[in-house]
Amino acid sequence: MHTFYKVISLLSLILLTVNPSFAIVNQLSHDESLEWPTDHWPENKIQLNDQDFKKIIDYTFSTESIETLGRTNALLIIQNGSIVYEKYNKPINRNTKLVSYSMAKSYIGLLTGMMIDRGFIESKYEKNLLAEWQDNRKNISISHLLNMQSGLDFVEQYDNNGRSDTLEMLFGDGRFDQASFAASVALKSITPGMKFNYSTGETNILSKIIKLRLQEQNLNYQNFINDNLSSKIGLKNTIFEFDSSGTFIGGSSVFANARDFARFGYLYLRDGQWDGETIVSKSWIDDTRKPAKNTYKMYSNKFWLPHPASRSLPKDTYFCAGFGGQYILIIPSKDMVVVRLGETYMRDNKVIENLSKIISFFPTR
């Protein structure tokens, strides 16, 4: 299992009784004196002469940091609607598409909200989701799948030492129809919704449900994403990977450059609004920023909320996280989105600490 999730599993015992406070800070509207970043990001790059800032940036992108941070490929900071800092590690550049890994799960969170807004999914609490679920799995709700609480006996492992449903789904017999593979797993808990269990499989199941509901409306999944998200907010350098069954691999597979990942984060920072249009309702964004029940107050609608492993971040931060140290941080108190892409294959809480130090040089709004 990836070390980030090992840390989360260990901390969950502590979080039953203790969790750092999570601040809800109102998010600002876009500054209409600036163009929306649909085609181009406005740039207002800072010139920080602070030697401490230069020192930490130099360290972040140096070979000296490999043992603690891994390799940092990209760092992009958006504040007040403009790029204020951007740096890449060669040969990576601003046009390079990099894999999201589990940050893709947050895209499924967004798509679920868009489906509910349109009435294609009744609500988060809708059950009887798949025809093949005729046993107690019929009691699994959309909310359970959003918040890793289905009760399915899906084993999230990233090595070959024992059973790994994740590897079998991604690279084994399940790879052609990943959601159906995950949906075939039996229940471990008789009653869904009682326990948080991190699962890439659950996210792919939810993606299949989205596909099926779109088919009921005679809509193609890829076209729906393009027409209602990508073309609206300018995701010109983003690829959504689909498996052979036509289901978006929402558990792990978005490829994008840092600027497009920042657009996704900026949509959330602006309460789902983009250049006069509502991409997803503000109520969905608000719901995402509140911890879901039975998630140890650290997860909601496929986003992470502050917890001990991220305690150095501002307390209102909510974020996407992926294997290898991929992050999209959304920080309303600083009117900021931070994208960090890298290759970190050790405990990546050091990456969070590093980002926290960098963020501290930028003013609170």
How does the language model describe each region?
Residues 8-17:
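Bacterial N-terminal signal peptides
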Residues 16-93, 117-121, 147, 179, ...:
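N-terminal leader/targeting segments and the immediately adjacent pre-domain N-terminus
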Residues 99, 117-157, 184-187, 215-252:
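Active-site helix/loop module of the DD-peptidase/beta-lactamase fold
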